[in-house]
A protein has these predicted regions:
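Acidic (Asp/Glu)-rich catalytic clusters
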Residues: 52-56, 82-91, 114, 118-125, ...
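N-terminal beta1-alpha1-beta2 module of alpha/beta enzyme domains
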Residues: 1-88, 193
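Extended catalytic-interface subdomain
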Residues: 150-187, 191-198, 208
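A conserved active-site cap/scaffold subdomain adjacent to cofactor or substrate pockets
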Residues: 201-235
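Flexible, glycine-rich active-site loops centered on histidine and acidic residues
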Residues: 2-40, 103-170, 216-218, 222-226
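A general structural detector for well-ordered alpha-helical segments in enzyme core domains, enriched
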Residues: 50, 81-85, 110-114, 155, ...
Length: 235
């Protein structure tokens, strides 16, 4: 068994009466009132130090993720957090769970940044491809709900082709129309870094994981017993 130190990177100084005053920690908590930029900078540095300490303690992987307008996980760009971890002399995997694919237009940006992380880390990247929460994709970035899955599948195809096909080549999708797909560099790992799918139990995501032989990561917010029952359905 392997252990990953996953850091949600929450804002650590919400008021005691937060739940009485505000509806949610996601999308709507007012940034002028609740988020001190100076403290946010300190928190990010503390978060990196904690991840580095987990590396020193021998964890098999260091996990980061992406959320937006979110007080309990305010890392809006996981690759920025992953890069200083990637350059450390370490055996720990850099587990980015992940880049919310429907938000990237064009999605070649994910292919480029993940490839660079893989090269800098010496081939330690685990590439997470979550569909994303409705709060991120619809609430913050304004993606129409009916387009979230189609954008996700097309982004997946573009990224994996960019990693495995000789460039340059053209990609003519519905949402990504690129005359030249030719990322410099391609990933160090061949044919590409391991791809993990993080999800909350959607059968569509399960099927996509099994169809492509990807690792599935269940995001448990309801405790062990509920998670165990749900995952038995997957297995």
């Amino acid at each position: 068994m392997k252990s990953i130190w996953f850091h949600f990177q929450g804002y650590r100084d919400l008021p005691d009466d937060f739940t009485e005053k505000y509806d949610s920690v996601w999308v709507t908590p007012p940034n002028d009132v609740l988020c001190d930029p100076e403290m946010a900078g300190k928190y990010f540095n503390w978060n990196l130090e904690e991840l580095e300490y987990a590396d020193e303690m021998g964890f098999d992987g260091l996990g980061v993720n992406e959320h937006h307008s979110n007080a309990y996980g305010f890392s809006c760009s996981p690759n920025l957090v992953a890069m200083p971890l990637a350059r450390r002399k370490s055996q720990a995997a850099i587990v980015v769970l992940g880049a919310t694919l429907p938000l990237y237009n064009p999605a070649i940006r994910v292919a480029e940044e993940f490839a660079l992380l893989d090269c800098v880390s010496g081939g330690r990247l685990v590439a997470g491809f979550p569909v994303g929460s409705a709060m991120d994709t619809v609430g913050v970035y304004g993606t129409p709900p009916t387009m979230v899955r189609p954008r996700y599948y097309e982004a997946h195809d573009l990224i994996t082709q960019a990693w495995t096909r000789p460039g340059p080549f053209a990609f003519n999708g519905e949402y990504n129309k690129l005359r030249y797909v030719n990322p410099w560099p391609k990933p160090l790992q061949t044919p590409h870094p391991p791809i993990w799918l993080a999800g909350g139990g959607s059968i569509e995501t399960w099927k996509f994981a099994t169809d492509n032989n990807y690792t599935y990561n269940y995001l448990s917010f309801t405790g062990y017993q509920n998670s165990r029952a749900l995952m038995q359905g997957y297995w």
